[in-house]
Amino acid sequence: MQIRYFLALSLLPQLVLADESPTASASQCVIEPPVPRIVSQPGLSAADQEKIRIVSDRSNAEMGKQAIFTGDVVFSQGDRHIAADEAILDQATEQFDANGNLVFQDNIFTVTADSLQAQMRSNRATLKGAQYWLHGQQVHGDAEKLQITMNNNLILTNTNFTTCPPDNVSWLLEAEKIKINSEEEWGEIWNAKLRIADIPVFYIPYMTVPVSDKRKTGFLYPSFSTSTTNGFEVSAPYYWNIAPEYDLTFTPNYMSSRGLFTKTEFRYLAGEAQSGRLNLEYLGNDQMLSGSPNRYLYNWQHQGAIDKNWRVLANFTEVSDNNYFNDLKSDVNRATDNQLSRIGEVSYFERNWDISTRVQDIKVLGEDEKPYQVMPQVNFNYRAADFWNNLDFGFNSELTNFAHDDSDMNTATRLHMAPSLTLPIHGPSGSLTSQVKLMQTNYWQEQNNSAFDGLDDTVSRTIPQVRINGQINFERFTELFDQNYRQTLEPQFQYLYVGYEDQRGIGIYDTAQLQDDYFGLFRDRRFSGLDRIADANQVTLGVTTRFFDDHNQEATKFSLGQILYLQDSKLGYEDNLFEQNQSTSVLAAELDTRLSHDWYLGAAIQYDTNSSNNKKTEVTLDFRPEANKLLQLSYRYVPDLLNSNTNDLVNISQAGVRGAWPINDSLYFVGNWYYDLNESRSIETYTGFQYESCCYAIRLSYHYRIKTNYDDNIGSAVIDEREQFESGVYLNLVIKGLGGSGPLGVSDMLNDGLFNYRKPLYLRN
């Protein structure tokens, strides 16, 4: 016999825990409860969701008194279900008791228990002898008593939990009491013991852990390392969730060879579209340096939009000494960074014009000669498409004041204006863009040193420019290595004329020579900045061919180009630094190709056809059979590269190998090795192993790298001896479920070092 009761009473509170979406890796670790899920009836109205439905084999009920249900009792209310052998409902006191093969389920978790006592009037319930499983996750455990309070919280007494599979419990947290706040989505734990491999390793009198991705104040995962530079090192970050729009991370970092190194990061949101970060780092009395100086860093970054038109940007960094990034692991810059950026900018944008004001001060570590400061620079740009008879009009201008910390250095104010007319012609088979520009620049220079007597107090420079750039697109279908391809042939040419004017009376404030890669051949200038505008009468010829497979994916791209100088640049006769008196530029070629489904080749060369010398070569060969498998070989050669620390010319000939490979489903290897062929020495070695299971992850890595040591500018007058190379061992451990999945990942291992995976030929800067 089946009897159904429909009551407008609420049995148990609805827990409001976060519905976390498991990651792809986590989905393979989901632990399902040993009892089947009770399927809710779909399409119920809001009123029906509140009704109680009881189904049983037998029942004995009298109105206003007890109702007794026996035999496969199923109690349902919306998404909540209770199954038991026997249940008693006291209608007078609104007490509901159930026992015998008891199962409680909702959309958050499943609980099996010996007995259940629920007070429907106060929305409280107690389950004894409980085992619980969180749906869609791997969190599960036991509790002597599990209480659901009237304010939607959970209290577990004499309990434990883990994220490991039941047949392989690598770690287990046992606690006297756990309280889970369903609204705040965090838990409090009292008198806890952490067992690893069933061995108690930690006693924790009190701790808090998040039960979702919601931010929560508390300690983050510690890390351990040892190195020849800092000795044994341990850090224990503490996270403070101040407010929804503010948070702070404080990291005490103890180094046995140096002392206590503290790092503080404050992050904030300002309105809907602005954000910023403030970093403070401090090491008092560095024991590794003579004089035990204090070392510090402070950095402020801010960016965002005030409204749809206004933009703001700020970035300011200061450090105590030249070797700060080289000696200490900063959260702001890497060891190879030797420039500190100090920039502030406010911009306003309209459809056809924009204006910005900018201040900039770049500090170069380890160099006595300091760059000029931009204090300030105002830019105004105007553009009008189809201004007249298909002509586009543009106007670019800037007003810059150059200052310097050294009072002996000359200073200057520069006004530059460049109106232009452009005729663009575009079609499916090619394009032709013609442009005329007039560049007017005025300087007002103040000389503070006799070494700059050759400079003029005022300079007015007017230079015309004509630029014609054209490209034609050819296409055909062809067969190569038994594969069908669609091939394009894209010849490109550019004629550039830039007038000449004597510029020896102008100082060098923000100008440097640009690199001559393939795309650089089609620039309209040889220098960054505006202090030198090289005269030109030249033609650039280039060609690009591409091969597309049957899926319209680019399989190969090859580009080749060179500049033909119709006359020597007169600017070279004024200053040997900018000399250009050859008939042609370097011959630049670039290749990117997919050799097969798994092999990829990238190469670039700059060859001087006048002197028959190789000016630059870069080659990378990648083997990527799957998303998580990589083997990369690289080589670069750069002759006569200026070492800014010694002002000497050096040749770079460097080979490298980088790999990332899973040994099995849980163990991953990442390593790299870079070798200096000229000096016959290794400049960086990195080896890392990472093991990750459903419930914990551990990484062990070894790092050996060359150091960039600068002259000391801190502490005593004694120049401290620094090792040319540094080596160290690093250990990271994450226990999943105690605060999230942790920071470990293969991608950051690939980029942990001097050389980036995507740009292995360049030092990170």
Swiss-Prot record:
Residues 1-18 form the signal peptide. InterPro entries: LipoPS_assembly_LptD, LptD, LptD_C, OstA-like_N. Keywords: Cell outer membrane, Membrane, Signal. Its main location: membrane. One of its GO terms (cellular component) is cell outer membrane. Disulfide bonds: none annotated. One of its GO terms (biological process) is Gram-negative-bacterium-type cell outer membrane assembly. It comes from the Bacteria. It is found in: Cell outer membrane. Belongs to the LptD family. Together with LptE, is involved in the assembly of lipopolysaccharide (LPS) at the surface of the outer membrane. This is LPS-assembly protein LptD. It comes from Shewanella sp. (strain MR-4). The lineage of its organism: Bacteria, Pseudomonadati, Pseudomonadota, Gammaproteobacteria, Alteromonadales.
